[in-house]
Swiss-Prot record:
InterPro entries registered for this protein in UniProt: UPF0761_bac, Virul_fac_BrkB
Transmembrane segments: 48-68, 105-125, 154-174, 182-202, 216-236, 250-270
Name of the featured protein: UPF0761 membrane protein xcc-b100_3490
Similarity remark: Belongs to the UPF0761 family.
Membrane topology: Multi-pass membrane protein
HAMAP family from the UniProt entry: UPF0761
Principal place of residence: membrane
GO CC terms, sorted: plasma membrane
Annotated compartments: Cell inner membrane
Keywords per UniProt: Cell inner membrane, Cell membrane, Membrane, Transmembrane, Transmembrane helix
Keyword Magnesium carried by entry: no
Amino acid sequence: MSRVNTMHQWKERLRDRARTASFGRFLWRRFLDDRLFQAAASLAYTTVFALVPLAIVVFGVLSAFPAFNEWKDALTDFIFNNFVPGAARSVQNYLNRSLEDLGKFTVAGMVALVASLLITLHSIEQTFNSIWRVAAARPKVTRFLIYWTVLTLGTMLAAASMAMAAYVFALPLFRTTEGQWLAEFAWRLAPMAVEFVCIVLIYRVVPQHAVRLRHALPGALLAVILMEIVKWGFGFYLGNFQTYQRIYGALSALPILLLWIYLSWVSVLLGASLASSMSAFRYQPEAMRLPPGFEIYGLLRLLGRFRQARLHGNGLDEDRILALEPMLTDTLMQELLCELKRIRLLRRDERSNWLLARDLDVVPLAELYESCQLRVPVEDRPLPCRDDPYGQAAAAALEQLRQPLRSVLAQPVGDLYTHLPGDPP
């Protein structure tokens, strides 16, 4: 092996180590910034109140289709047998009684139940938007349609999947010894597969952000692993320690269910944070990083890109923006885009591309400075991509902004008070 190839391999290894270490630090910061444990506690509390209305919607959808009626009990048993701790199974009886008494509910009661369900779904969407650093939520009508589609289609797909599985496993192939072993193995694997598919769909559908499948899959895998660990831990504790029953008595199912929902949300949100971090992370060498305080340089370059795209009658999606401006992090890009949208300088089209909404020739720099609340740095720092046309234009504008400040900021602070009256005796 030549010396040149050896040097190249060592450089790649060092770069990979630096990339891995950088991603580890980035992931840890995102975990801390997302405050996932507080968010999981809030979602667990609202989820408990949404269980009854959720069950009403789910089984109401199944009741609307006579073909799925026979699968209601099977679906309920499958959920509680595989996803709920045994000590909290008494909740199943409560839900069944609530569904039997559905006809006795008043209009006000039904409105309250539906409102609690919508509040829970809205809280879930807000949490996921926060994890993916999305500032603008969906319009209310679009949000409601997505909620309703997920609940109805999800329920129908779950029932159809169980019916299909029952049909397949009833074939003569699965009546043999090997076939029965395979069917038993598949049924044991089914809960994890259901968890994995559902979490992937949640990551892809719920946030107001384009989440790629290659980012959602590792996040969902982490969430499923954590949920299985939680299941095992719950089973071990509840099977060996009965203190909680002596403390809570007949009410022991409620705190166990609440803790179970909380830990499940922690698992899902940790997976979401991993998926978000994978989509947001971009390894930047030192020379390509935007110095702190020079965000205005990135903003001016970004607007130059939008101006050029408008001349060609095009918009820019977020992946294209990051490819054109490698010094922008995903977080900074989202912040700049949201601010520019807030002041109606940018808008999104039906394909989620960003477009200029106003002519830059009539937008003063003062509006950008005041609205985006960016500082004008006085010191000189090496700037990435400074020699290309966009960098030259942005650097020239930045120099014009800070030149008058330099002479003012160079004077001693004491000179500001020379015209004040003398100190009192």
